[in-house]
C-alpha cells in the first residue's frame, strides 16, 4: 500500500502541525487495505481523494486478503473518525492544513484464525523490541511535526504517547 500511503503523507505533513491524532495500529479493513490510518475505503477514495493502486503483500493471510480500495468491508472506527473530520472541516485540504492522523505502530498482526492482534496483546518477548521501535518512530514523528497537541485514540495509544514523548513540548489528551 506504499503508493497510497505516500500520497497520504504528502498531503498530511504540514510542519509545524497543530494536532496529531494517534491510533494503535492498522486495522484489517482500514489501513491494511488503503495505506491510510483509520482508512475507511469510502473516506479514503471520496473525501481524502486517494485512488492509488494497492499491491498484495508477499505473504497474505487467507482469511484477510488485501483487496485494496475494492474492499467492501467497513473500518467502523475510520468511518466515524474521518466522518467527524469531514463534518468539522468540510474538505480534506482544510483538515490537512494543520492535522495528521497516524498510528503508533505501522504494522498489522493476524492470528492464525484471521483475527487482528493488536500490539498490546503480543507476548512480552515480541512486544518489548516492537514497542521500543514504535516509541522511537513516534518520538521522531512528533519531533519533526512539532504539534501543539497529540490526541490519542484509545488508552493504549495515550499510554505509549506519554511514555515515548517525555521531554517533548506536546500536550497529550
Regions from the PLM with identified roles:
Residues 1-149, 158-159:
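A polyanion-binding, active-site-adjacent surface
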Residues 155:
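Flexible loop residues that form catalytic
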Residues 162-164:
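Distinct, well-ordered alpha-helical segments
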Residues 166-173:
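Short, flexible loop segments at boundaries between secondary-structure elements
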Amino acid at each position: 500500500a506504499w503508493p497510497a500511503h505516500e500520497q497520504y503523507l504528502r498531503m498530511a505533513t504540514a510542519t509545524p502541525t497543530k494536532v496529531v491524532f494517534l491510533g494503535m495500529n492498522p486495522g484489517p479493513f482500514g489501513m491494511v487495505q488503503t495505506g491510510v490510518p483509520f482508512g475507511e475505503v469510502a473516506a479514503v477514495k471520496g473525501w481524502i481523494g486517494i485512488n492509488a493502486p494497492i499491491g498484495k503483500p508477499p505473504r497474505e493471510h487467507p482469511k484477510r486478503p488485501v483487496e485494496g480500495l475494492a474492499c467492501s468491508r467497513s473500518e467502523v472506527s475510520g468511518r466515524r473518525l474521518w466522518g467527524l473530520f469531514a463534518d468539522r472541516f468540510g474538505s480534506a485540504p482544510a483538515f490537512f492544513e494543520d492535522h495528521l492522523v497516524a498510528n503508533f505502530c505501522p504494522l498489522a498482526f493476524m492470528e492464525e484464525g484471521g483475527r487482528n492482534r493488536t500490539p498490546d496483546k503480543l507476548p512480552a518477548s515480541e512486544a518489548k523490541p516492537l514497542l521500543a521501535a514504535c516509541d522511537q518512530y513516534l518520538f521522531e514523528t512528533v519531533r519533526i511535526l512539532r504539534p501543539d497537541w497529540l490526541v490519542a485514540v484509545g488508552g493504549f495509544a495515550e499510554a505509549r504517547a506519554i511514555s515515548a514523548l517525555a521531554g517533548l513540548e506536546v500536550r497529550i489528551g
